[in-house]
Design a protein with these regions (language model features):
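Conserved phosphate- and dinucleotide-binding cores of soluble alpha/beta proteins
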Residues: 1-164
C-alpha cells in the first residue's frame, strides 16, 4: 500500500532513484538498460492489442503517460489487468479492444489473476488461444473460444484473426 511504502521510505535509500521524465522516459535510456516495463491495461484483445486509457464508448479513464515509450523500447513489455470488471460481469480479455494504446507488436506478456500469457513469437491464432486459456476468466472462455474458431473458419488466410 501507499501508506506502507511511505512508512518505510528510508529503507529504500540507495535502492530507488527518481529522475525527471525527460530522462526516465527517454527511449535510448530505456533501451540501453533493457528495462522490464510493467504497465496496466483496461482490456486486452485476442490479438494482444492493449487499451490502457478508455472505458466503454470513449470515456477516458487515465492518460497513457510514458507507457508507450516503455513498452516499445523495453527489454520485456508486461501488461497486467484483472480478468474481469464490474464484479465479474465484463471480461477484460475481449475479441477487440475499444481503443488501441499499445499494438500487438509492443506487448509481450499479459498477466491477470488467472495466469500469464507469453505472446512472443506466436501467430495471431496462437496468441488468442494462449490469452483465453491463461488469462481470461473461466466464465468467458467458451464465448471467446467460439469467437476465435468462427473467425478462423471464415478467414481465407489461416494465419490471423478477422473481424466477424
Amino acid at each position: 500500500s501507499r501508506e506502507r511504502f511511505y512508512a518505510h521510505i528510508d529503507d529504500y535509500k540507495g535502492k530507488i532513484i527518481l529522475r525527471p521524465q525527460e530522462l526516465s522516459n527517454a527511449p535510448e535510456v530505456i533501451r540501453r538498460l533493457s528495462i522490464i516495463a510493467m504497465n496496466t491495461a483496461i482490456e486486452v484483445d485476442l490479438a494482444g492489442n492493449v487499451n490502457s486509457t478508455h472505458i466503454g464508448e470513449g470515456a477516458v479513464m487515465n492518460g497513457i503517460g510514458g507507457s508507450g515509450d516503455y513498452a516499445r523500447n523495453s527489454g520485456i513489455a508486461i501488461f497486467s489487468t484483472a480478468s474481469t470488471a464490474k464484479d465479474g460481469a465484463i471480461s477484460c480479455i475481449v475479441p477487440h479492444v475499444a481503443h488501441v494504446d499499445h499494438t500487438e507488436h509492443d506487448t509481450e506478456i499479459i498477466v491477470t489473476e488467472q495466469g500469464l500469457a507469453d505472446l512472443r513469437g506466436l501467430t495471431a491464432y496462437e496468441r488468442a488461444h494462449v490469452l483465453i486459456e491463461n488469462c481470461a476468466h473461466p466464465k468467458f472462455r467458451p464465448g471467446l473460444r467460439e469467437y476465435v474458431e468462427q473467425a478462423y473458419a471464415q478467414s481465407k488466410a489461416k494465419h490471423g484473426i478477422i473481424r466477424l
